[in-house]
Amino acid sequence: MDVTNVLLKPVLTEKVYFNQMGETKKYVFVVNPKASKTRVKLAFELVYGIKPLKVNTLIRKPTTIRGGSRFPGLSKLEKLAVITLPKGIAISVTGEAPEKTDKPADKTTLKESTVKEIKDTKNSPEAVVKTAVEALQIKPTAAPVTTAPLQTVAVKVAKEVKEVKVEKPVKVEKPTKPAKVAKEAKTTKVAKETKAEKSVQTTKVAKETKTEKSAKTTKTTATKTTKTKTTKKEVKK
């Protein structure tokens, strides 16, 4: 069996990380199921260059897996090797690159060459200031703009405001349209006609009700008289 086919992949779990907190650190690898402990030791020495203190092997049996179909599946059979290292020795299993601790230099710091030039030069102080400004990359500020005093500006503005006169807008009454006037006259006429018709109808109904009531009263009186006459005839007999 080739040594390269013994250590397949590392196992990275919380339990493994917890075992790596102490002085004696333990690492777990998925191993070829046909490999023995001696094979695992040799493979580890060739890959990492460290002799392990102890090697223990475990067999992880297949378990049922519920997949997308209704029939459950099974996981693969795996053989694990727990390798313990001597005290004070550790390895990087993940293969991650170490973090960079170098910080970028500040922009305001001077370069070493410019500082030496400033110290060595025996010229006037103006040249020294120029070299320092170029090293710091400072842009010179613009010259201040000369402005007139505030009092004179305020007087000018006040004069201009007095001279300017704002004319108020005059309200213009809009002429009424003849169509609207005609519509209003029609509506008033219709209202008057409807009121007159309603009054005539109410008077007619009142008269009819009075005549009907008088006719009913006459009928009732006539029936009463006939009844009295018949009763008198019966008594005489």
Swiss-Prot record:
Alphabetical keyword list: Ribonucleoprotein, Ribosomal protein, RNA-binding, rRNA-binding
Annotated region described as Disordered, given as residue ranges: 174-237
GO biological process: translation
Any Gene Ontology CC annotation: ribosome
Residues covered by region (Large ribosomal subunit protein uL23): 1-127
Disulfide bonds: none
Comp. bias (Basic and acidic residues): 174-198, 205-215
InterPro entries: Nucleotide-bd_a/b_plait_sf, Ribosomal_uL23-like, Ribosomal_uL23/eL15/eS24_sf
Region (Unknown): 128-237
Function: One of the early assembly proteins it binds 23S rRNA. One of the proteins that surrounds the polypeptide exit tunnel on the outside of the ribosome. Forms the main docking site for trigger factor binding to the ribosome.
Complex and partners: Part of the 50S ribosomal subunit. Contacts protein L29, and trigger factor when it is bound to the ribosome.
Family from the record: Belongs to the universal ribosomal protein uL23 family.
Classification via NCBIfam families: PRK12280.2-2
Record's protein name: Large ribosomal subunit protein uL23
Lineage, uppermost ranks: Bacteria, Bacillati, Mycoplasmatota, Mycoplasmoidales, Mycoplasmoidaceae
Gene name as annotated: rplW
